[in-house]
Amino acid sequence: MSKAPLAVALQYEKGTVPVPRVVAKGRGDTGEAILRLAREHGVPIEENAALAEALAQVELGEDIPEALYRAVAEVLIFILRASGKLK
């Protein structure tokens, strides 16, 4: 596995986007740029190398596969709780 930063951005909007979808992904300089933009815009970042590698296999604009629903749901719940949007 490469040491270059890997970043995968997901879009999910309850009621609008029913399944999280991959909207950006990249390794190295591109991964760093995705992370920088996320930080600049206050987008939560979760570090999970195994999940990022699995999500990186999904084509841009595609919904995540059902096999990753649980792992992604756990990340979304963590983010919502951390932001105070879920108690």
Sequence positions of predicted segments:
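Divalent-cation
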Residues: 1-87
